[in-house]
Amino acid sequence: MEYNFREIEKKWQQRWAENHTYQVTEDESKKKFYVLNMFPYPSGAGLHVGHPLGYIASDIYARYKRLQGFNVLNPMGYDAYGLPAEQYAIQTGQHPAITTVNNINRYREQLDKIGFSFDWNREVRTCEPGYYHWTQWAFQQMFNSYYCNDTQQARPISELTEAFARYGNEGLNAACSEELSFTAEEWNAKSEKEQQEILMNYRIAYLGETMVNWCPQLGTVLANDEVVDGVSERGGFPVVQKKMRQWCLRVSAYAQRLLDGLDTVDWTDSLKETQRNWIGRSEGTEVQFKVKDSDIEFTIFTTRADTMFGVTFMVLAPESELVPQLTTEAQKAEVEAYLDRTKKRTERERIADRRVTGVFSGSYAINPFTGEAVPVWISDYVLAGYGTGAIMAVPAHDSRDYAFAKHFNLPIVPLVEGCDVSEESFDAKEGIVCNSPRKDVTPYCDLSLNGLTIKEAIAATKEYVKAHNLGRVKVNYRLRDAIFSRQRYWGEPFPVYYKNGMPYMIDSSKLPLELPEVAKFLPTETGEPPLGHATKWAWDVEKGEVVENNLIDNVTIFPLELNTMPGFAGSSAYYLRYMDPHNAQALVSEKADHYWQNVDLYVGGTEHATGHLIYSRFWNKFLHDLGVSIKEEPFQKLVNQGMIQGRSNFVYRIKDTNTFVSLNLKDQYETTPLHVDVNIVSNDILDVEAFKAWRPEYNDAEFILEDGKYICGWAVEKMSKSMYNVVNPDMIVEKYGADTLRMYEMFLGPVEQSKPWDTNGIDGVHRFLKKLWNLFYSRTDEFLPVEGEPTKEELKAIHKLIKKVTGDIETFSYNTSISAFMICVNELTSLKCRNKEVLSNLIILLAPFAPHYAEELWEALGNTTSVCDAQWPAFNEDYLKEDTVKYTISFNGKARFTMDFAADADNNTIQTTVMADEQAQKWIEGKTPKKVIIVPKKIVNIVL
């Protein structure tokens, strides 16, 4: 009986679906284990072989935990909102919902063929109203909350309104956009609109003026990671910096908790460090500077308070509100020209680019420690969102300030004894302070730092600043609030209407607010987002429903928000929704949340380190504050799978001809390498006829072969349609089967490493499965396994495998597991193993890797339940102990022969036995050995 993978895989996929094999419910009698993949965006291209890598890795682990007796949740869904479907709608007129559903159906078909243990009963799609109901609900909760710094948690905004009415904001310690000061009397005298504007300063979801990446052609704001080299990642359209009123989430309020939480999760050190750097905590000092000949003052933040005496100029971010205030008439044209240039660069590009650019504002600031007037410059190396958007420049001790000072010929004053700043800045925080103040200058203040260490000088300056009302000590974070608006159609609508220009939430009992139909998916002619085309997009407060726009009276019927939510909105709490996806009353029930708690294993790419993995942690912490999520951290263990790169093939066309020369002959001609479809190449040998049929221009191609074959060149590149190196998993499944695909993807290398796809090795994995099959079936279709006692050798082989595979799965070293399977099968084949107990354990071990194959043989062994419900075998160390040990017998360090000894033989027995052996006597030749050296369990060396 041959291994017929097509019949087997079809049979078991159907059986799993009919029996709901992977459907799971809360079971208090079992320990839970929650496995989750970062769910895919369903693109039109479908899956290539790189996409399932992480899914296969997590599926192996999920199956393994189920075999260990855990109740395993392993769901799948779709991150269904996104730009590609909307762009396709703009080009074709086809509604994004249709495109998305078609793409999802294609993805589902491909995923099913690979044999994943997903509980499809829990599938979520972020574009469905039943799902985004809870995205809208969470947004409303954020709008109706503020962040209390004293208790370090979100609290109801109603607490603030009550406190303001009684005490004003005296003593309030809350996260805010700007620091305000007002009394209860002043608050109570304000209009409703004025009060709402003040509350907006504290809400966790708020409207704020922010600098954004604006793409005119796409008509929307883009996140930093959607912009590359000043153009949009999608379409390559120009992107500029623009100030807009946008919905924002006060992620910055959670900065310290986001940092602290990293100490409680099992993530890689590199990913944790990436997040720590992104959050960017720094302890420092805020200092007030006065503008010369003006009443204007501004604040800077510095972590190097010891360097105040070395400030030789100030720098403002181009977006700073101080720029128009401090720009003199004489400098106005030059400044405006500079601002136009900087608008074309994203913050990320500005951080990465070390080129020096800037312009003088025309104004000067007074250094409060020296009394000197220092010039105020404008430069894009200063960012508006970090600190105060203004810096004091100390070129002697900061590399970017140093480069700026050198470029514009500004003074450089060293502040550390013995430091040389003739070629570069001295950035080390070590040494003895000098020139603070300079000896040749009359002191302006009564502070002297000379002779102190840098650490002592920082502390002394902080005390001086506080004592003389020059500023305050402060902790800053680089982490910004998240911009939460997009000027697109295909996204979650905001459950918001506008009254007197201020936002109000629709009643939560009326959620979800569904996305309306529009005639066009582009912005309106007046520049409004695509929802501006909707004719039925107004909110009737009394009826609690959406009505026609022409009914708007701004009394009971109001306009609805025209922006939609960004891509990360739907993915920020999907792990919670999987716990209870059909609950119409809550995001997740208390029972489900308390049972599943959080994700035990999360698998996805490192590209989400500073996006999704920050936002989802913030979102979960907020829901934890509300008592919705029992765990503060959503993902306990995170594994980042590497990328499967493409292995491109090349043909070599002789210049000015349609003749192609084989790889090893190409140096004899002047050739041009051309990418060729890898699907018509096998083991680097081109299917010449398929190539001629591939493209019309190659129909009459001629070939110069070697040994009757056309050998292609190859290179490892990104898997891309333009390089013709995309491999469709459907083709691999059709040719070799899903179990071969699963095992081969794991065999390519460690899960976390990137590696090239190379079909040249897939035959070996397929042959392994055939060889294993032969342990169960003879060539005459006889079923071979029988009952009986296993031999010592069989027990040793299988328990060695149990130990190896168990350890490898725990560490995601799947590639070495598969090597171990191959070794074990070779050993069992040599032993002519027919033992049912041994072979049953072998199949259980294989089940996570090759589930269809394992199910078929498990059933053949007489089992009536799924192999998924078998018990993972425990290894017995006793079976791995060696009864005998092979010693190498050496004479004067040269190995001559080997001898076997009992594992517990003592040195005296070993020496006596060796010396009496005929082979030893031959090499001793009657001499008396000087000494005998025995290395336990390895070598006996006789020194003559």
Curated annotation (Swiss-Prot):
Keywords assigned: Aminoacyl-tRNA synthetase, ATP-binding, Cytoplasm, Ligase, Nucleotide-binding, Protein biosynthesis
Top-rank taxon, per record: Bacteria
Renumbered ranges of motif 'KMSKS' region: 718-722
UniProt enzyme class: ligase
Binding site for ATP: K721
MF annotations from Gene Ontology: aminoacyl-tRNA deacylase activity; ATP binding; leucine-tRNA ligase activity
Species this chain originates from: Phocaeicola vulgatus (strain ATCC 8482 / DSM 1447 / JCM 5826 / CCUG 4940 / NBRC 14291 / NCTC 11154)
Classification via PANTHER family: LEUCINE--TRNA LIGASE, MITOCHONDRIAL, LEUCYL-TRNA SYNTHETASE
PROSITE patterns, per database record: AA_TRNA_LIGASE_I
Cell membrane among keywords: no
The organism's taxonomic lineage, starting at the top: Bacteria, Pseudomonadati, Bacteroidota, Bacteroidia, Bacteroidales
GO BP: any one term: leucyl-tRNA aminoacylation
Catalytic reactions on record: tRNA(Leu) + L-leucine + ATP = L-leucyl-tRNA(Leu) + AMP + diphosphate
Pfam families linked to this entry: Anticodon_1, tRNA-synt_1, tRNA-synt_1_2
Any one of the GO CC terms: cytosol
Similarity-based family: Belongs to the class-I aminoacyl-tRNA synthetase family.
Name the record gives this protein: Leucine--tRNA ligase
Motif ('HIGH' region): 40-51
Annotated compartments: Cytoplasm
